[in-house]
Amino acid sequence: LGIKWDEGGDKGGEYGPYVQSERFELYKKYAQKLIENGEAYYCFCAAERLERIRKIQTENKMAPGYDRNCRHLTPEEVQKNLAEGKPYVIRLKVQKKKKTVFHDHILGDIVWKNEDISPDPVLLKSDGFPTYHLANIVDDHMMKISHVMRAQEWIPSTPLHVQMYKAFGWQHPEFCHLPMVNGSDGKKLSKRHGSTSLNEFRARGYLPQAIVNYVAMLGCSYEEGKEFYTLDELASLFRLEHLNKAPAVFDYKKLEYYNGNYIRQLSAEELYKWTLPFITGTGDATLEINPENPQPKPNVGPEFSG
């Protein structure tokens, strides 16, 4: 897509390492810190016990979740279990009373009952691997992430993340939960609507600048009456307040319109470069395409015969 990140695993930077498997010691360090601060605890419950709890909850139509059994172990009991080498996970002490409040740039203030947060989720597994929640919070804080922008389906996880930031004594980043991108039927965009992966769009002849331009326009407004922007223009004009609350609809015909505009701007040399894989059967044109996909291939130029 022509998007170049400032830093990363293949580029280096100030906040590495950038691969989570190289950050395990960091996650262990901060999980241990939460225990020392009384914000997390060792859980020695066996898998069989947890399965019995799940079964009871399912049979009685109860909300799923851990029963906080090990939260009440005495320091002596904890030390005894550790000395005996019992396997454990580390769980967060989720606040059980009151509410968690956070501000979202699109949805405003969101109030969440703490009793509705998953009770004391695992932060560090028995094999030393972090769960998503621990890795997410530690990575974002250590890498000085200022804004977390993600789909609205992640809202239920945010109260937990806010509590985790508070447990660490850190200021949480600003949140912006984006509405979903839907298909023409108003349902979440999926394979049944057509191509959804970059590889498929590329194999069908869509230019990177067309994809970037169209996707950037979904659910966001820029200058009135203007449709086409360069990547630099999009970056300079983007504002959080320009984002829409309502879900956007992915219109394949509109994307084809954008693609046609950028194709017509290509020089003869550029057009040759982009059409050659389709003529020779090499490069992107060899990528597998779902034959049942209703999305038609775009017209990349005049038909060839010979």
Describe the role of every protein-language-model region.
Residues I3, E59-N60, L243-K245:
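Secretory-pathway/luminal and periplasmic proteins that interact with or process carbohydrate-rich
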Residues L1-G16:
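A glycine-rich helix N-cap at a beta->alpha junction
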Residues K11-E14, M143, S195:
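Short glycine-enriched loop/turn motifs at secondary-structure junctions
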Residues Q20, K33-H177, N182-L189, S197, ...:
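Active-site cores that bind ATP or allylic diphosphates and position pyrophosphate for catalysis
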Residues P156, F168-G306:
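Catalytic adenosine-cofactor/nucleotide-binding cores of aminoacyl-tRNA synthetases and other
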Residues Y18-F24:
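Acidic-and-aromatic substrate-binding clefts and catalytic sites of carbohydrate-active enzymes
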